[in-house]
């Protein structure tokens, strides 16, 4: 894709995610059956957090595209570095994780993650917008342009910090209300929940490393700026 086409693509995807972030929280806002869905805000659902994260990433990517055309590549290194860090450590791993875990649980027993009653309020296209299209958008981004990956230590630490923060959010929600964010946790013992959270981090860390492999396969080694010695 040309630079102009890439810029237009990022702009269109950004607007798609802006629309989803506005539209989905409005669905069934006054419906009693969806009170639990709306109570507590979007931060309790990884799916909705991911949509917000994707909007932020594509916003930064769009800004990076525009600034490169206006003031040049060398003058916006911070924006480009932030774009790459955001994509490699969060946007790609988390969107892929949501896609894989949701559809695995959905096909095993949808009541564990997306009860059938939600179909009365969320059309199929909304479900796929939240849980399906997020993956091809992220995968396409990996082959659209090279991304400079941080060190594995830094990348996995940042990903782990996000994972830990979200676990705290889930547990805090349970302490406050006595209800789990996702029905799957109702069927697990305390040990099972610990194993689930541990397996989730192992999976998302594996996705991070897989994304790094794809980046290397498509673009080869990307030289990192050398740190100046004092």
Swiss-Prot record:
Cysteine pairs bridged by disulfides in the record: none
GO annotation, cellular component aspect: caveola; cell surface
One example GO MF annotation: hydrolase activity
Class of the enzyme per the UniProt entry, highest EC level: hydrolase
Alphabetically ordered keywords of this record: Cell membrane, Hydrolase, Lipid metabolism, Membrane, Transmembrane, Transmembrane helix
Keyword flag Protease: no
InterPro entries per record: ADTRP_AIG1
GO biological process: cell migration involved in sprouting angiogenesis; cellular response to oxidised low-density lipoprotein particle stimulus; cellular response to steroid hormone stimulus; long-chain fatty acid catabolic process; negative regulation of blood coagulation; negative regulation of extracellular matrix constituent secretion; negative regulation of leukocyte cell-cell adhesion; negative regulation of lymphocyte migration
Extracellular topological domain residue ranges: 29-45, 107-120, 176-190
Ranges in the topological domain labelled Cytoplasmic: 1-7, 67-85, 142-154, 212-230
Family listed: Belongs to the AIG1 family.
Protein name, entry field: Androgen-dependent TFPI-regulating protein
Organism: Mus musculus
Lineage of origin: Eukaryota, Metazoa, Chordata, Craniata, Vertebrata
